């Protein structure tokens, strides 16, 4: 099967069986579908919360430039837009998204939340194996002299 996403994230559009996701009779890579859905969420959020009179072509061109040309994660863009709306940042045009993603406070909050999320996942995934927690046992051979006798070669 071939990925039908216009901006496929892989060099070859071929989809291995384990990575194939079907939506509306179209085949996608898991990451491609996730990116497409995130971009749609960004468009919906912008339209509903920022401006209903936005020119969609301009909005999509700006989002595609950020995600595919600048290689900014679509999830980060969605997070940044939500944070900007929550803080009351004035967004007059889709081009403002370029500046929102560079906001120092938003970047720090994103890193803090990702670090907390990774820490939470690590705690959930770590299984306390009692045998791994026990100290290793060492055996000592008494065939050779110990202490200063071993250093000086004496018996």
Feature names for model-found ranges:
Residues 7-15, 36:
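Cys/His-rich microdomains that often coordinate metals
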Residues 18-72, 140-155:
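Long, charged low-complexity interaction segments
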Residues 1-5, 62-82, 123-125:
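Compositionally biased, low-hydrophobicity segments enriched in charged and small polar residues
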Residues 3-8, 29-32:
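Short cysteine-rich clusters marking metal-coordination/redox-active sites
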Residues 75-136:
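Short, cationic/aromatic linear interface patches
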